[in-house]
Amino acid sequence: MDSESDDNPNDPEDRKKWGHKDVEHWRAVSNVHYYAREGYFGTAILVCDGRLATIKDPALAILKGVCLTLLGKIPDAIRHLETFVTDNDVALGALHALKWAHASAFNPDNKSIVEIETEISTRARNEKTPYTSYATASEVLYFAGEYQKSKQMLDIARKRATEKHAKHYCLLGWIELALGKKQKSTQELFEKAGGQEYPDGNIGRCKILEGHHSAPEMKVAANELAISTIHFLPGHIEKAKASIMMKDWRGVMDCIMNADQPEGSNPYIEVLRTVHGICYAGEVSMLKRTLQLLLKSLDENEATNHVLYARITKLLVSISGRDEKILRHARDFLTRALKISRKPDYVALSMRIAFGLGGAKEVSTLSQELVALDCEDSYAVLSSVVSMLMISRVSDARAQFDILPSAHPKLLESPLYYLIASVLAKQSKDKSFENFRQHIENLVEMLRNQLQSFPFGLDYLSLFSSDLLYSAVEQCFDFYPLVPIKAPDDCMKLTAKTLQMIYDVAPGLAHCTLQLARNSYLCSNTNAAEKWIEKVLDKDDSLADAHILRAELILDRGGKITDADDALVTGLNFNFKLRETSLYHLIKSKTFKKRNENDEAIKTLKMALQIPRKEPSKNLFQPKESADTHKISVQLELIDTLQHMKRIQEAETTMTDALAEWAGQPEQDQLVIAQAQLYLTKGHVERALGILKKIQPGQSNFHLSRIKMAEIYLEEKKDKRMFAACYRELLKVEATPGSYSLLGDAFMKVQEPEDAINFYEQALKMQSKDVQLAEKIGEAYVMAHLYSKAVNFYESSMNIYKDKNMRLKLANLLLKLRNFEKCEKVLRAPFERDPEPVGTETIQTYIQFLLLLAECHEMMDNVPEAMNDFEKAKSLHSRIQDKTLTAALKKEGARICNLQAELLYRRREFSQAVDICKQALAYHETDLKANLLLSKIFKEENKWTLVLQPCQTVIQVDPHNDEANSILADFYYIRSEAAHASTSYTTLLNTNPQHWHALSRVVELFCRNGEQNAAEKHLDRAKEVNPRCVTESGYNVCRGRFEWYTGDQNEALRYYSRTKDSAAGWREKALYYMIDICLNPDNEIIIDENSVENPETTIVEEASEQQKLAKYYLDLLGKLPTTDRFLLAQNFIRMHTTDKSAIQAALDEFNRMAFNADRSQVTNVGAVFGVARGHVLLKQVQKAKTVLKMVNGRVWNFDDSDYLEKCWLMLADIYINQNKNDQAVTFLDLVFKYNCNCLKAFELYGYMREKEQKYVEAYKMYEKAFMATKERNPGFGYKLAFTYLKAKRLFACIETCQKVLDLNPQYPKIKKEIMDKAKALIRT
């Protein structure tokens, strides 16, 4: 019965009831099935023995026989199975298993096989044969690999059974999976089995999800299994595998711990522990024990399972990164396999290990054995070539290498083939780096393609071949610069890409990470190098070379010499042989040089030159790096130190000796270029040019010297003419397409595209099929603003080269030119020709067409069509991800979703945008754009509780992300967490001093905290970075706010007024602040209850002027949407008068805004202050007090802070006038709690103590106020001097008076009333 019939509602199978659940049997069978499928046959037998020792279970006993057969224990299997051939319930299964065992014997007993086949036929035709017998036979045939026969047997079993059995559904699922049937129907079979709590059904679900690369769903399914089925180890193993797929290495270790197995008891668990240890933990001290535990576990559980030993060996070698210790341990595993069976594949694997360890003799021996064996493994086929290259027999190796692909075409798909090709390219006559680079690129690309279809897991890691990748990296060492260069060249980029590939898979391989640090250091990216070194030491702090590189970095970055010394000593402690290397002495000399101990530096360098040169290895796979080429760097450093000490003659002699020593060797060319680079780093530009000019045509480094000279002329001397002349000289000597192209690149670099076009066209004539050259011509036309020519060129090139990238470039250009119709036509054309693209690369290109089409449709205001384009792009992307979901594909899926979400965000369709962002995060959980967009949306929707999580995710990935840090700081600000907010805003300003939003918040927070100097430093720093920032509205609002806090209202008004004509935002803030100052100049209330009752002409006129000016500013705001803040300002202006009717009208409006319908709750603190102010002006003080008390207990926040402060100050003022000073102090202290710099609070406090004649306490308050205003406010100066006088602090009084008069000569009142009296008192 096919699985398709399970979907049929009329299927008789569906009308049957489910059979009995035998939980213990199910668990045992599921365990055995799992281990047998995974190749752990010995472990499966132990599970069988454990159950069979306590209970009779014929079906399980048959499975034991199957496992014995799979393990190659044929006699044991036959003896065991013969006892069950008469058991009617399992006879068919026993007979099939017995037939398989006999057929697997070294000398099969054909007579016995015929007899068994006869018995099978008889029983199969017998109607009385029970369904269990057929079901058991189906199991046996499944494990024998006869899936079609297995299915036939299972169909009969299901028909004969009177009940439905979960075991049957599950087995059918595994058979269909093996036959490659539709996975949807197969998944339904597993789900039906799993629904009946049959463990292997859930394992099947995990297998399908693994094939779909659906790690999160697989982890959920495995987790359900681990929880629901107690002590079912495969559930924990599958969960660990899902964690590996997600690269959640900590989760892997959690699964191992939760499995709760004694160390070394289960080989599968130990494999996972070992993979975690090598790929992630990287703890060298623990790794030896971990590998020993794995070997012990295999010896105890799988002693005769040579296939498993070999499989684990291959896994270890593949993830070793060619680490010597791991390879030696791997050899121990392979030795077990080879003792049992000397299969050709095992010998080839042995060859791979020997090659990795650099054992030329062993490789030679194994090569001779492999030649005699029939083995298609690339290590076997290429073994003799490898052997020859390891002893420098280049010509013999090349001759054999050239003919091998014709006999073995599959070699061209082998990464090892391209590694050998790269070595031979280095040994060719022209020593072309381009050829070498191409072979390494092919190696990386070939490996990447082979891995693409595999989910990230144990099979992926077995194929990964980090040992080969690291060998490829080592080959690049010979092209490394001797001293750091300004920007990475092709070699450094290639190496970094390869190393990054290793790091992405196995960050625990510290020696590979160290090479990333070294790469960054040589590319002058010291920040990245430092971070990589930290990661290296985090994994393996015993790596001496990491400490040495750290010392070098510290010195180059101008760090503490003691730190560099410490790093050197630490490195030396871990590897004392470092004293015998030139590098150690080179770095040691630099520490002496930093201390100006130049004689010691020279002595150390000379000592390094006396170290005997190591004999270069004949092994061409070993880089010359290991032969200590740092000697050249030592010679260059010695020359530089001697020159620094004016010992010119000695320096020249050293240079001559160095050139003579390396004469005729490739190092000689490197020496000259490195010397020029060294001069350049010291700022000696002319010396560098002088050395490079000496290199003449015909010398191997002529090409490189002229490119270096061009770089110096452009970047150091800003001489475009000489920059071009260097390339012209190159062209004169080498008139190749490459030289013409280089000259074109040079003119593009100096913004002269017309000249570039001429040279590019010349190169294209010589190399007409070069698509990259054609692209460069198109780019040059665009740079030259020759758009119609660019369009025509792209159109013709698109038709000539049939290149999809040309179509993209044409469409992009048409989009920029706003030629939407033609752009749409160009992008739609491929879909009209081929609506259903096939192949990963083609589909990816079509996705780019759709994304560009979406942009085009959005610009045409055809948003529905743009959304349709995005959906098509996602649909195409899902077709690729069904096959494989690599990290790059995940990021691409997230990018598509992000572009769609950004479109929705721009249209303020937030709900849909959030949904699409979540789709992006399903692809890539830590995607920066998606998380950042979610944060922005939640911020705009005022959903602050949702802002934090996506924002923190961004910061974890990118700690210096400006936008995320700004949103996070705002989150803390809104939550009134001042300390957190200050720290976050300060971090932003350290990165960008002109981050006006952060600066405005910092001014607010610091001034409230009494740290005006700190606030002013940030303002001054912004001005230092960009003196023109004084014209920017953001700066002026921040400065105005600072001046307001420090009591200079006129200065504040001056800064605010500069923003009146700027764009909304800062302008709006400034206008509100200006209105506030107009109504409350110098922090003094002009209109009070007395002026309303008895209006004086001067007060009425002054109030009228202020009101008019405030109205003017309000009118400027009138075009903005009416908000609560606008209404507050409007009514405060209306109240700023002596007209009682106007005051009452404003009061009524404030009453409407301040409370809810039943007046039980405050809805607007600003309006409450307005109500209270109105009551005070109308001499209804008690009513004012009652209203103000309603804000008591309100949680303080920055939004309400100004008006809460005003309410508390008004209450304090009322209590002071009523002589209730204790109550007044309560509210003044409340003000100081949130604004320890409040001038009005200082004033009221001082006034209150004056009334009590406590002049010492009064002057302390006035002192704080006067200091807060930078001693510029004459009012506070007067009050301070007066209280000094009353407290008999006469000299302080006179000094204060003098300060006031120095700044305000027009303030004679202080001299007459206070200063003169103080002087008179001193005289008496």
From Swiss-Prot:
Sequence ranges of the TPR repeats: 58-91, 414-446, 582-615, 669-702, 737-770, 772-804, 806-837, 847-880, 894-927, 929-961, 963-995, 997-1029, 1033-1066, 1205-1238, 1240-1272, 1274-1307
A biological-process GO annotation: cilium assembly
Gene transcribed to yield this protein: ift-139
Pfam families: ARM_TT21, ARM_TT21_2nd, ARM_TT21_4th, ARM_TT21_5th, ARM_TT21_C, ARM_TT21_N, TPR_7
PANTHER family associated with the record: STI2 PROTEIN-RELATED, TETRATRICOPEPTIDE REPEAT PROTEIN 21 HOMOLOG
Entry-linked InterPro entries: ARM_TT21_2nd, ARM_TT21_4th, ARM_TT21_5th, ARM_TT21_C, ARM_TT21_N, TPR-like_helical_dom_sf, TPR_rpt, TTC21A/TTC21B
Protein name according to UniProt: Tetratricopeptide repeat protein 21 homolog
Compartments where located: Cell projection, Cilium; Cytoplasm, Cytoskeleton, Cilium basal body; Cell projection, Dendrite
Similarity remark: Belongs to the TTC21 family.
Taxonomic classification: Eukaryota, Metazoa, Ecdysozoa, Nematoda, Chromadorea
Keywords: Cell projection, Cilium biogenesis/degradation, Cytoplasm, Cytoskeleton, Repeat, TPR repeat
Domain of life of the native organism: Eukaryota
Gene Ontology annotations for the cellular component aspect, listed alphabetically: cilium; cytoplasm; cytoskeleton; dendrite; intraciliary transport particle A
